[in-house]
Regions:
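Sec-dependent signal peptide recognition
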Residues: 3-9
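Formylglycine-dependent sulfatase
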Residues: 2-3, 18-386
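Hydrophobic h-region of N-terminal signal peptides that target proteins for export
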Residues: 11-19
């Protein structure tokens, strides 16, 4: 949910924080490739009680826009600039680039270098100068080849997470592995799950703070971006509903709830459906694709649990009342590789060795983006409205 006018006024907003008599803490929580209607407070059936409670006490934006893709949206969010001005007009650096090899995402012009340039300052750099502690946990995706591009060199005091754009939730490794501050980490031992670990480190950074200065915490989950990997107990909460109802009924139920909530008005029409109707699928296809959606929903549900864990920590430590909390997504739901029934094999779901596909597919992505057209990487509402 990267709103254009927020981004363009972000430095001014941060400056006002820095001059305030009682500076608020700022917690910025970003999810990855989540659709407009996925969470409960926007009409979704996915169980997100903590995010819903946060929304009920705050402000929900219904026309909040982004750049339609992960790293350009993050570049704008961190700098308050159009993504080309910051150097990431299309994609960030390839995690598997060889040493002394030019990144395929460096197009040789300033707007398409694939990493944050030095013609911009980040929110973290501005807030740090204004007396804030600055912490980050999660997905960076703003440059990785050379420490000068890493979070600690762009204003953050502490960092734990991935520099790349995606990883295995269960065993991040290699070019998609973990980094703590400026140190690459070995592959973690099982049991491990990125959503939990990122939240634990975010809490740890705040908890280790020795003074009473305000803090800026950027918690950037890699969920629910592919690969489909979730805890079995969470998956089981959703398998029945998607198999029994299917995507046509789920989509219509979301539209009705969104209308009742005032997210959309009663005259809003669905974008044209680009897939088969649920009843046109074979029973085997229904089984497989319903399971994919259940895993996706479980990923979102785990994010909600961890949002609750962070908020509980802040409340118990008397920090919540003076904390501005923002929850947003980098872009719309992802249909990659644009196959109706999803990418990769069902047997690859929850394989720790997978750091890319499997994914949940074009049809469920369109449900996630109810009532909009298209998906991530497209300049339609389904890509840019989150």
């Amino acid at each position: 949910m990267v709103k254009k006018n927020f981004l363009m006024t972000a430095p001014l907003l941060m400056a006002s924080f820095c001059s305030a008599q009682e500076k608020p803490n700022v917690v910025l929580i970003m999810v990855d490739d989540m659709g407009y209607s996925d969470i409960g407070c926007y009409g979704g059936e996915i169980l997100t009680p903590n995010i819903d409670a946060l929304a009920s006490k705050g402000v929900r934006f219904t026309q909040f826009y982004n750049t339609s893709r992960s790293c350009p949206a993050r570049a704008s969010l961190m700098t308050g600039l159009y993504q080309h001005q910051a150097g990431i007009g299309q994609m960030s650096e390839d995690p598997f680039k060889q040493e002394n090899q030019k990144s395929p995402n460096d197009w040789g012009v300033p707007g398409y270098k694939g990493f944050l340039n030095r013609n911009c300052v980040t929110i973290a750099e501005v807030l740090k100068e204004g007396g804030y502690h600055t912490y980050m946990a999660g997905k960076w995706h703003l440059g990785m080849h050379g420490e000068e591009k890493w979070p600690l060199q762009r204003g953050f005091e502490r960092f734990y997470g991935i520099l790349a754009g995606a990883c295995s939730y269960l065993r991040p490794s290699g070019g998609r592995g973990l980094t703590l501050d400026n140190t690459k980490l070995p592959t973690p031992e099982a049991p491990y799950y990125t959503t939990d670990a990122f939240t634990d480190y975010a809490i740890r950074f705040v908890d280790e703070q020795k003074d009473d200065k305000p803090f800026f915490l950027y918690l950037a989950f890699n969920a629910p971006h592919w690969p489909l990997q979730a805890k079995e107990e969470d998956i089981q909460k959703f398998t029945k509903i998607y198999r029994e109802k299917g995507w046509d009924e789920i989509r219509e139920a979301r539209r009705k709830r969104m209308t009742k909530m005032g997210i959309i008005d009663s005259s809003t029409e669905f974008a044209e459906w680009e897939n088969r109707k649920w009843d046109e699928l074979t029973e085997q296809e229904k089984d497989k694709v319903a399971y994919r959606m259940a895993v996706y929903a479980a990923q979102v549900h785990c994010v909600d649990y961890n949002v609750g864990k962070l908020l509980d920590y802040l409340k118990k430590n008397h920090k919540l009342d003076n904390t501005l909390v923002m929850f947003l997504s980098d872009n719309g739901a992802c249909a990659e590789p644009y196959a109706e029934l999803g990418g990769g094999k069902v047997s690859e779901i929850n394989d720790p060795a997978c750091s890319v596909f499997p994914s949940y597919g074009r049809a469920w992505a369109q449900v996630s983006n109810t009532p909009f057209r298209k998906y991530k990487c497209r300049s339609y509402e389904g890509g840019i409205s989150t």
